Amino acid sequence: MITPQLLAQSPLFAGLPDDYLARFAALAHEVTCEAGNALFREGEEASRLYILLSGKVSVQVQPTALTHPLTIVSLSTLGQLVGWSGFMPPNYYTASAICQEDSHLLAFDGAAFNRLLEENHEWGFTIMRRIAGVISQRLRTIQGMVLKTLYHHDEQ
């Protein structure tokens, strides 16, 4: 059973009231992803977002000019967010999530997640701010990769 206490271990939900967490817990279901499998792939329609319970998941993008994917971030800490595109229009995953180890995650339906955010603007804003922080960090990582690639290219 997914409990408010389990959700509270995630930075996304930490510090929120138990009654609000209980409503999110009711939406969640556990999923497993075997090592080497994709939780989702870049460009696929996004309808879910995930919270990591255990294992290791790499978030990767596949630039068309490269033959191999670039890893943006490797997630291995309880509570980390995977697949924020699942509740954010235009609802297509902007990266792939590849399980590097057998992994267990909580899955949330993106539309239902959004409805709960809208029901309580104060806590919904708190969660959205935390998600924006995740997105911002990942964009900074990608920006650093691009700049490093361009700088390296200019030296050659």
Report each predicted region and the residues it spans.
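Cytosolic regulatory regions built on CNB/CRP/Popeye-like sensor folds
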Residues: 1-156
